[in-house]
């Protein structure tokens, strides 16, 4: 929308335009990670690409972040809110596949308990990208109603691995009911997570 203030036009972004901008930024970030992985994969000697982390023990993960980071003004209860999470990560169990269980709660009273699996893509010695998929039970509290109690979460985490081998990383995820509910708005999550060996 354009408003005239004196003789100078001022462009005022509408809520929908801001959401489109946020989604474009998120898409660019995801594209950047994908391009980096493709480049690393096509130059494996330089990037030292390996799959799985068989030497790593089971780990406890704790962290926080934001839930519903790309809000839609048409949804009741929408809007970004903080979250706190905890996970137990079993380590590589079947080839490079590592299962996990976890839960998070949000500042609006939402709760999600879930289980899933992921696999590590190690590159440049200390960096790890872990794509994951999970399914679990969700209650929305006073936040956005995702349309069903059964919700699926997909995404990836980018970590720096320390020598001990704890990790510190950031994750970006999408949650939705995959169409099993009457409506399926979906949300995005951003997390910062510290994982520590659990012996």
Residue ranges and their predicted role:
Residues 82, 185-199:
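Outer-membrane beta-barrel "beta-signal"
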Residues 88-92, 119-121, 160, 174, ...:
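Residue-level signature of outer-membrane beta-barrel architecture
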Residues 1-55, 199:
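Cleavable N-terminal export/targeting peptides
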Residues 60, 92-97, 125-129, 164-170:
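Repeated loop/turn-to-beta-strand initiation elements of outer-membrane beta-barrel proteins
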Residues 67-71, 91, 104-110, 122, ...:
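Sequence/structural signature of outer-membrane beta-barrel proteins
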Residues 84-88, 115-117, 156, 192-194:
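Membrane-embedded beta-strands of outer-membrane beta-barrel proteins
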Residues 62-66, 99-105, 119, 131-137, ...:
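Transmembrane beta-barrel strands of outer-membrane/channel proteins
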């Amino acid at each position: 929308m354009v408003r005239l203030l004196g003789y100078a036009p001022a462009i005022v972004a509408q809520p929908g335009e801001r959401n489109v901008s946020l989604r474009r930024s998120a898409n660019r970030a995801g594209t950047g990670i994908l391009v980096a992985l493709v480049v690393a994969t096509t130059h494996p000697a330089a990037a030292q690409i390996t799959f799985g982390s068989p030497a790593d023990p089971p780990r406890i993960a704790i962290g926080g972040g934001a839930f519903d980071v790309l809000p839609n003004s048409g949804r009741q209860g929408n809007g970004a809110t903080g979250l706190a999470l905890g996970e137990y990560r079993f380590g590589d169990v079947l080839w490079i596949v590592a299962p996990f269980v976890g839960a998070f709660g949000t500042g609006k009273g939402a709760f999600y308990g879930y289980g899933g699996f992921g696999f590590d893509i190690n590159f440049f010695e200390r960096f790890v990208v872990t794509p994951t998929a999970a399914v679990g039970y969700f209650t929305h509290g006073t936040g956005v109603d995702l349309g069903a109690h059964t919700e699926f979460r997909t995404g990836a985490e980018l970590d720096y691995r320390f020598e001990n081998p704890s990790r510190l990383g950031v994750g970006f995820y999408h949650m939705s009911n995959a169409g099993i509910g009457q409506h399926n708005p979906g949300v995005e999550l951003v997390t910062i997570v510290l994982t520590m060996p659990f012996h």
